Amino acid sequence: MANDDTTTRSPVRQPFLLYAAKGRIYARNRTQKVIDLGAITREDGGSFRYLLDGNQQSDGGFFTEEEALQAIARSVRFLWLDGQFTAVADARDDANLDLDGATRISIELDEMPPGERAVDATV
């Protein structure tokens, strides 16, 4: 009889792309939906700062937009980002959206393992 121990299964990883374009942070999921996550601005000293709309998370002092995106990638959780894709309108409907040539990074986030509680303290 096979052992059906679900606690040893690896979590499923979901791919996303994060973009910095025209002063905004965008995310794209595997279904190609694009959402606007918040602002990215250049401070007086030349460094970049971001502010996410959904949870007011912010940070600054980044030399490049890519560094800011990497910081977001390190702190964002799957449940929060997945919830944003449910709650926020598809930015592809905005005629002004242009991600060609935008700074971007690829990330993968772990979904919840089976049996784990669906609570995200970062929301």
Spans of features found by a protein language model:
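A detector for short, charged/polar N-terminal pre-domain segments
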Residues: 7-17
